[in-house]
Swiss-Prot record:
NCBIfam families: rplO_bact
Keyword entries, A-Z: Ribonucleoprotein, Ribosomal protein, RNA-binding, rRNA-binding
Underlying gene: rplO
Name this polypeptide is given: Large ribosomal subunit protein uL15
Region annotation Disordered: where it falls in the sequence: 1-46
Length: 159
């Protein structure tokens, strides 16, 4: 078998060419009915248009506020996760987690939660840690260091 002998198992369906003469059955108005806004190119009203009455998005008042663009999203890891992936005496930081392909960068930092058990002495350098996780790390003789989240520094204004 050669490349030029290949053919699809199901033949390609020919597309319907509309507006190509009355004998095709799809000539003249090309399936768009008689005249009017919808028969024109780009015609028709927007999906949210309600015929001129006051639309729902303007009838309903605005409520609350959103702080979503300033929200910090942390990559959450557990003590059980650290126990599985790190050896005794190792350092846990954003760099070591990324180098071991355990997390993806692109979030605002790493947060450790106290789920599971920790049986190893670790040096933990993360952005946030829960009280129970901190207590568990220090109970095994490890240390906890909070690292600042790297962000944009504000430009000093000229006075």
């Amino acid at each position: 078998m050669k490349l030029n002998e290949l053919s699809p198992s199901v033949p390609k369906k020919n597309r319907k060419r509309i507006g190509r003469g009355n004998s095709s059955g799809w000539g003249k108005t090309a399936g768009k009915g008689s005249n009017g806004q919808n028969s024109r190119a780009g015609g028709g009203v927007k999906p949210y248009f309600e015929g001129g009455q006051m639309p729902i998005y303007r009838r309903v008042p605005k409520r609350g506020f959103s702080n979503a663009i300033f929200k910090k999203e942390y990559t959450v890891i557990s003590l059980a996760f650290l126990n599985e992936n790190f050896e005794d005496g190792e350092e846990v930081s954003l760099e070591t987690l990324f180098n071991k392909c355990l997390i993806k960068k692109g979030r605002d930092g790493v947060k450790v939660l106290g789920n599971g058990e920790l049986n190893k002495k670790l040096t933990v350098k993360v952005h946030k840690i829960s009280k129970s996780a901190k207590a568990a790390v220090e109970a095994k003789g490890g240390t906890v260091e909070l690292v600042e989240v790297k962000g944009f520094e504000r430009a000093e204004t000229n006075k």
